[in-house]
Amino acid sequence: MTTITPCLWFDGNGLEAAELYVSVIPNSRITDVSYYGADQPGEEGSPLTVAFELAGRPYTALNGGPQYKFTEAISLQLSAADQGEVDRYTELLTDGGGEIGPCGWIKDRFGLSWQVVPEELPKLIGDPDPVRANAAMQAMLGMMKIDIQAVRDAADAAVATA
């Protein structure tokens, strides 16, 4: 069976990152760690790769060195069932030096970008009623962390005044 596993390049802290991610996201675990050997480019005995699962999907963290950095061109989209999950994921993933950006985007302390998205948000901004959809979109565009009740209220208010 063919599989695809995203490989995330870290500068020596891939195990620490994987430990954070599996502690935050349900149904997640570290499945394997390999280590640099004596004749390899990294420090002998330090983690080379970390295989882990997030929400049951495979990932690899590679401690490749400082040559490459994460950018917002790649992000992990994390679906949140409700506002409590949005708040929890945002808090835990930005703890220790992460940043909160616009429209639910965050960057964790390792530089990896995430989109913390309430499950209801795509329905609101994709509503078949263009007035509701636009109001929801405009509300979201003015936010940092998504407040799903405020987005819902904006959509409802737009219909009430239309």
Question: Over which residues does each language-model region extend?
Answer:
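C-terminal cap/linker of serine protease catalytic domains
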Residues: 128-162
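Vicinal oxygen chelate
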Residues: 24, 54-57, 69-70, 74-113, ...
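Active-site-proximal beta-strand/loop segments in catalytic clefts of secreted hydrolases
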Residues: 62-64
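Core segments of cupin and vicinal oxygen chelate
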Residues: 8-56
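A charge-rich, low-complexity, intrinsically flexible signal that marks solvent-exposed coils, linkers
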Residues: 2, 40, 72-74, 162
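Conserved "turn/edge" positions that cap or connect secondary-structure elements
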Residues: 7, 54-55, 120-123, 130-133, ...
